Structures are given as structure tokens and as C-alpha cells.
Regions:
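Extended, charge-rich alpha-helical interface modules
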Residues: 1-80
Length: 80
């Protein structure tokens, strides 16, 4: 996955997250949508991690295409 594809995914997920937050603020969030919001947050963490891996590999003179998404349970515990 290219940097551009990852950024596109991040943007898409962020837009979906914002829409769900607007619904939540209006008191219109169904339980399934609340669950989706949780999944989006985890997927965003994973996508940002992959983008950071690619940048680190590139900066080290290595092939960024060797970066792979890490398991969600690994990236969700990272400190911001």
C-alpha cells in the first residue's frame, strides 16, 4: 500500500468518524454505529502506524514497501 493510499484511507476513516461524532452529539447514534466508531478509531491507529513505519524505513534507506500493518492489539496500546 502506498503512502497516498494510506493517507486516502485515513481521510476516509476520519470523515466517517466525524460524521458519527456529529450524530452522537445530536443523540442519534445507534449501538451499531457506536461499535463502528470504536472500530474506526482502531483502524486509524493502525493506518497511522503503517504510515510511520513506511517513513522510518524510507529514512533508514530501506524499502518502505516492506512495512506491514501491525495487529490492532499492538498499535492500540501506543502512547500518543
Amino acid at each position: 500500500m502506498t503512502d497516498e493510499a494510506i493517507r486516502t484511507r485515513i481521510n476516509h476513516l476520519s470523515q466517517e468518524e466525524e460524521a458519527l461524532y456529529r450524530e452522537a452529539a445530536a443523540g442519534q447514534l445507534a449501538p451499531a454505529e457506536l461499535e463502528r466508531l470504536t472500530v474506526i478509531k482502531l483502524e486509524l491507529d493502525q493506518a497511522w502506524d503503517l504510515l510511520h513505519q513506511r517513513e522510518a524505513l524510507r529514512n533508514a534507506g530501506m524499502d518502505p514497501d516492506t512495512a506491514r500493518p501491525r495487529p490492532i492489539d499492538m498499535v492500540e496500546g501506543y502512547q500518543q
